[in-house]
Amino acid sequence: MSDMKIHFVVSPAEYAQGFGRQCIKQWGETNILKASYVVSIGGDGTALVAEQEALSAYLLTGQMLPVYVIDYSNTKEHVGALTNKGITTPQEIEGRIKEARKVPIYPLQADCILQQTNEQKSYFGINEITVKISRYEMTYMDVDILSKGKVKDSFYVAGDGIVIATPMGKTAYYHNLGGKSFQNDRLGLQTIAAKKNINKIIPDNHQVAIWVRSAHRPTCVMRDCNRTYQ
C-alpha cells in the first residue's frame, strides 16, 4: 500500500459517506496537520469546506496542501463545477492525484472591524466574500475601491448587500445574482437586491473598503456563503 497521507473531507450525504468509509479503510485517515493531501468527497460545497480546512492548516503550519475533489453525488441538481468525475473505487485515488494538473487558488482576505468595540477579525473566501443583511431590513453601505491606498472609485449601496467574487467564484453565487464574467486577473463586485444594481470588474490587486452606515440594522460578513462575523 502507498504511504500517501490523506485527510478526507466527506459530504454528510449518506451516498458520499459510504464511499468515504471505503476510502478511509483503503488509505487510512490522517490529521490535516500531518497530511500530504486533502481529498474531498461530495460536491462543490464539500470542496469549499475542504479548501477552507486546507487554508486553516496552512495558517498554522505554513504548508499549503493540495486539495483533490472527487465528485460523489446522486442528485440531478448537483453541479460539480469544482469536482473530478469518474472515480468509482478508492484504489483509483492515488493515480488520479498523481496525474492531476495543479490549479492555484488565490483567496480573498476580509479584515473586519467592529466600530463599537474596535474588535478585529480576518477571514478568507475561496469563492467570495459577502457583506449582507442578517435580518429582513435594508442595509446601507459606502464602498471605496482603492489601489495603493488611493481611492479609484466610490459608490453607495442601499439594499441587501454586496458580493466580491474571485475568478473561482465567478460562476457561483455572484453569477446567480447577475454578475458578469471576468478574467482570471480580476475580481467581480455585485450588489444584492439593491435599489441601484451595480456590477463592477476590478483588478485583483485592488482593495475594497466597505463602511456599513446603520448600526441598528445588523449586517454580517460571510465567506463562501457561510456566516462568520456580525
List the model feature ranges, each with a label.
Residues 43-46, 73, 167-171:
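Short glycine-rich anion-binding loops that position phosphate/pyrophosphate groups of nucleotides
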Residues 72-161:
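Catalytic core of DAGKc-family lipid kinases
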